[in-house]
Design a protein with these regions (language model features):
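Beta-lactam-recognizing serine transpeptidase/beta-lactamase-like catalytic domain environment
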Residues: 1-22, 27-192
């Protein structure tokens, strides 16, 4: 009962991490576009699965999507296309962008109880791990981490630290707290 009472006061946007699933595909696509490994017209073929080592990893559409461009793969939420994109990125580049989008650490939001997600040790990550990570499985991030990362695409490539309050000023006009916009570049504006 105590855990139930305590959990009702936790902010699930920052205290619980989860598999982002297909919502993560925008990060995989943006990373590959930034590296010029794909373009919006790159072509993919989805037979309904992709074989990675000894694993047959299915698409949500068992019969497959057939031939598709990157734009189609995003619209179709095609797992095999994103596994191929992840393979093109490779483990170290995939991880580089995982970090660039701030997904390996807390966002820095001014809320109590924020946790960071969990990701593989890059030195222990396998091809299968990369394949499923490319479409948002087998690692965890918080909802706020995801929103912050995806917002970088909308912000012209700039990853902005989220804040609830911009500034606090006392009755004399003295600034007590100033959350100036902190950001770093996750990708080029042209890619975003």
């Amino acid at each position: 009962r105590s855990n139930v009472l305590t959990s009702q006061w936790l902010n699930s946007a920052v205290t619980y991490a989860y598999y982002p699933g297909s919502t993560f595909k925008i990060i995989t696509a943006s990373s590959a576009l930034e590296e010029k490994l794909v373009s919006t017209s790159s072509s993919f073929y989805c037979p309904g699965y992709r074989q990675v080592r000894d694993w047959k990893i299915n698409c949500w559409k068992r019969g497959g999507h057939g031939s598709e461009t990157l734009v189609d793969a995003i619209k179709n939420s095609c797992n095999p296309a994103f596994m191929e994109i992840g393979a093109k990125l490779g483990i170290s580049t995939f991880y580089k962008y995982f970090r660039a989008f701030g997904l390996n650490e807390k966002t820095g939001v001014d809320l109590p109880g924020e946790v960071s997600g969990s990701f593989w040790d890059v030195n222990k990550m396998s091809e299968v791990d990369l394949a499923v990570a490319s479409f948002g499985q087998n690692f965890e991030i918080t909802p706020l981490q995801l929103i912050t990362a995806v917002s970088a695409v909308a912000n012209g490539g700039s990853l902005v630290t989220p804040h609830l309050v911009e500034r606090v000023v006392d009755s004399d006009g003295k600034v007590i707290l100033d959350n100036t916009q902190e950001s770093h570049v996750a990708m080029k504006d042209m890619t975003a």
